Amino acid sequence: MYIRSNKNKGGINMKVIKKDGRLQEFRIRKIILSLERASDEARKSINESDSENISRMIMSEIRKLAVDKIESNKLKEIIIKCLKELGFTAIAEVYSKGSKK
């Protein structure tokens, strides 16, 4: 099932440092799209409320860092931690394996 949410409410003005050194704007929607694919692959359904909770938790964890740049591998760690804490272990495992680019 697709996670349908998020209008980057309370957006974060931050750059993501990609593995090749490029900088890219942080976009929660891009993360949500990746999680949609992971939930489909894990055959685990996530509803809109789940999506909002996941997004909120990820954004909260990022804000706590109080940085204007974050490495993509650190961002990945935060996403996986949030998924596991919210009980989406299977999706966290698929996401972890699938984002090795």
Q: Where in the sequence are the language-model features?
A:
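Long, C-terminal-biased catalytic regions of enzyme "large/alpha" subunits
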Residues: 2-101
